[in-house]
């Protein structure tokens, strides 16, 4: 992906933030959500600024596009909750722990790949 494509995507997010209207139509909620969209975009684009691998850049752009589409569809700028797979939170050690960590990583949707683990 080229720098122009990434910058175009960033500008698209900022345009969406400028024209965003909260689902509740309350001006305070609209302002809060606009600020969230702008801040989240700024944070994630800066966090991924040093990535040079074309595949990683492509994955980040796909994540951004997925979050845009989900946000516009549901009229909610915040990430959707995800649920852990069965046996994804048990307190095991060794091989079972690694299997659980692998399950959690596989269950993470594309639109949340940049989010920190909690």
From Swiss-Prot:
The protein's name in its UniProt record: LYR motif containing protein 1
Name the family the entry cites.
Answer: Belongs to the complex I LYR family.
Q: Which organism is it from?
A: Danio rerio
Which CDD domains does the UniProt entry name for this protein? Answer: Complex1_LYR_LYRM1
| Region: Disordered, residue numbers | 91-118
Superkingdom classification of source: Eukaryota
**Where is the sequence biased in composition, kind Basic residues?**
93-107
